[in-house]
Amino acid sequence: MLAAAAPALAGWSSSVDAGSLAVSSATLAAPTGVAAAQGACTPRQRTSLTVVVTWAATSSPGATGYTVLRGTRATGPFTAEGTVSGISTTSWTDATGQLRFTTTYYYVVESTVQSWTSQNSATASVTTPASRTCA
C-alpha cells in the first residue's frame, strides 16, 4: 500500500484508497512586496558588497520559512543563496562574498514548509556600485 505524507498546512490532505493515491492540496502562497537594496557602506571604502532583500510575510499560515534565490537575469535561472526560519522574519542580507561590482542581480523569494516550496515571488533587482568608494 502506498502512503503519502503532506505538510501540516491548512487545506492539505492525503488519503490512500485501494492502492490509488488521492491528494488535494492548497497553494502555498509566495511572499509579496519583494525589494532589494545595496547594503550599508562602511566609511571611506567598501570591504565587501552586500544586498538586503526584504518582503512581506506569506499569507499561508502553515509556512515555516523562506528561501532566497539570486540570478543575473530577470527570468533566471535562480540559485538558492539563503534560508530564513520563521515567517515573521522578512529580510535577508546577501553577504555570500560572491557579489561583484557593477553587476545587476535579481532576487526572488519562496515560502517553505518542510520540503515544499511556493512558486517564486515577483522579481526584485539591484545594481551593485561601480567602485569601492562610498558615496
Specify the residue positions occupied by each region the protein language model found.
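Short, polar/proline-rich extracytoplasmic segments that appear immediately after membrane translocation
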Residues: 1-36, 40-41
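Short, conserved beta-strand segments of beta-strand-rich sandwich/propeller modules, principally
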Residues: 7, 65, 104-108
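Beta-strand-rich extracellular modules
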Residues: 13, 58, 110-114
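Extracellular fibronectin type III
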Residues: 16-23, 112-135
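Short acidic/proline- and small/hydrophobic-mixed sequence motifs that coincide with surface turns
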Residues: 18, 63-64
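Conserved aromatic anchor
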Residues: 44-63, 94
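Recognizes extended acidic, P/S/T-rich segments that occur
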Residues: 65-100
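Beta-strand-rich modules
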Residues: 92-120
